[in-house]
Each structure stands twice: as structure tokens, then as C-alpha cells.
Amino acid sequence: YMSGPYCSMLLADAGAEVIKVERPGSGDPRRSIPPFVQKGDIKKAGGFMAYNSNKKSLSLNIRSNSGQKIFLDLVKIADVVVENLRPGSVNKLGLGYETLKEINPKLIYAAISGFGRLEGYEGPDSQRPAFDIVAEAMSGIMHLVGFEDKPPSWTIYGMADIYSGMCTAYGIMQALFMRERTGKGQFVDSAM
């Protein structure tokens, strides 16, 4: 669940206005994971801050009618939507690419998942959820790190999340450039 935040952080660092939509109450799970950085009375999770610099946050229940209305109002004026939720979850809410492109035909919609899900190119695992460690294990990278006499090892820093986030940000920039030439938005599909 870090590839989307990393991707959008890269866009924010490049000057984009990024609004991160978070679940009401708990927000992003990384908000509560140590280590914490404290300045005066304010205590923040270092990992959350590392992946969310230069962003605005909006607490929004996209499962409610009022939350969906606010979200769709934002989509009308957005250049890009980035999501890295379980495949199909936004479609169940009626907020997938097919719906959003009707509202904003110039929208660049980027979806990051474990195995990719571009229509016509789905593999047998396209609907399966995946975390960074799954992508690292299935790609073989875990076998290349660590020690010869030990079992495969996780790269710790989220290599698959970071790499897929970086590639997605690059894909979004290409899509924005293409939109300047054609006036059309598009779907950017990224697999970890």
C-alpha cells in the first residue's frame, strides 16, 4: 500500500497539487506505525511523513453518497487520479476508470496493483491482492539478497513499492504529455 503514496509524492515533489483521500477516523495506516517524530506536542509517524510530503489530506468516506459526491466533484477538475487498492474495489463503489472518464474525459487514471489489470492483458493473478513482499518473492529478488546459507530475505525498504510507484509516476507524466498533444486522458496500468 506504499506504491500509490510514493508515486503521488514524486508528483507532489515535482510541483503537482496532490490531495490524498483518506478513510475517516483512522486515515492512512502508516499514520500509526513507528518510528515517530515529535516536535513540541505534535507527534507524527516518520514513515507516513516520508511518503506523503508536499500533499494535502482529505478525510472522506467514499462509501457514502455525500463522500462520493465530493470525490466526483474533485474528479471533474482533476488532472490525475492515482489508486493502489485491491483490484475491483473502486469498481464496486462505482468509482472506477470507466465511470470517472465519463465525468472528466481528460483524466489520467493510474491504477497500481500486484499483477496489473489492463483489460485484454490480465494474467491469471490480476484480481489477486498483493503487497510488496509478495512481488519481491514472486520476482525472485528475495533470493538474490541476504546470505547464501540463509533463506531468501526481504529487501526491507519496499523495493517493489518504490519501483512501481516511480514507474507509475513516469507513466503519468507520459500520459500528461500525450494529453497535451491529443486532448485525451487515459488509463495507466502498473504492476508491482
Predicted features and spans:
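N-terminal helix-loop segment corresponding to the beta1-alpha1 unit
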Residues: 1-181, 187
